[in-house]
Amino acid sequence: VKKAVIAIILSFCLITLSAFAQETPQAEKKEESGQINGAAFRLDVPAEWNKVLVMYCHGYQIAGTRPNLNDPRLNLLRSAFLSRGFAFAQSAYSAQGWAVKEAVEDTEALRRYFVSKYGEPRETYVMGHSMGAVITLATIEKYPEIYQGAMPLCGPLNSILNGLQDRVFDMLVTFDYLFPETVGSLANVPKGSRLDTRKAKAALDAAPEKAAMFIKRYSIATVNELPNVLAFFYEINREIQERAGGNPFDNRNTIYDGFDDDAALNRGVKRYTADPKAREYLRQYYTPTGHITDPVLTVHTTYDQLVPGRYISEYDSFAKLAGTQDLFVAKFVVARGHCNFTIPQTLSAFDELLNWVRARKRPEAGEIK
């Protein structure tokens, strides 16, 4: 089960970490890796640096998994930026799991180190995938004077407390009701426990009509995807409870709908009370404010089994309330899967962000082809 969940993260979230320190001078570029305050990092500076720095924020990594510096997709992304003259900086963060708090601090520490060693960039941008998009957004909201723009990709840009309850917690709660003895209690989850994907698959196979109803309710394309999605969400819920000191989710006031028998489900589904301290932790890490002074361009795929597209659009509401809607643009790519962008699509989006910053030409919302 653990291998299956890890495979999801490695495939979708572009995780990149290093667990050693070394510096390797190269003829055409500078590459440096090391640690700052317990957070491994990697810096790449091309020989003909254009004086623009890109700070990259990686996605969720399961606590206890081995660091990986050689993710093929991230290597391609890094190489693409370097080939165009950009410096590229990555922090591995000093913690794993839902490490938004640590990641924002560690990313800023790495940026300061970069400036102290390689000089002040002409422009600095921050970008990231999945949970890295949350970190990107938190960074641009916290340090607006440092960055010229941000590109959060395929991440939940809504209230994390509400978003994780709506997608992660509620999916697990309702699955547990409809397919008994597959999930178990979601409060006081034992450390290291995992959801058994084989048991979940067997339950789905035994009730195909119910399975079809469930994936339609949660906009999952196929039944085969569901066990690994559930296992990943179970891990997120377990790890957040561990770091937050309790269960942050409360469904006592939730009225579930969209199922075959909503009345029966609402009568029978387990109800949970949130721990106030845990709830406050998730409020802080992170609830967007919409208070931005720099352009923010986000991109999402039209189908994402982990993060619904509406979670991207919700930042538009924050920006409207803050009076900053003109600084936020959401675009989409017609593709299936979490963070499933091509390198050309990513570079095209980044070019639009650069043009927005430099020429003050706000991109049109819509499709990136």
Identify the residue ranges that each predicted region occupies.
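Conserved alpha/beta-hydrolase "acid-adjacent" motif
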Residues: Q305-Y311
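Primarily recognizes the serine-hydrolase "nucleophile elbow" in alpha/beta-hydrolase
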Residues: K117, R122-F179
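Short beta-strand element of the alpha/beta-hydrolase
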Residues: K51-Q61
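N-terminal cap/lid segment of alpha/beta-hydrolase-fold proteins
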Residues: Q22-V52, R267-R271
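Histidine-bearing beta->alpha loop at or near hydrolase active sites
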Residues: L327-T342, L354
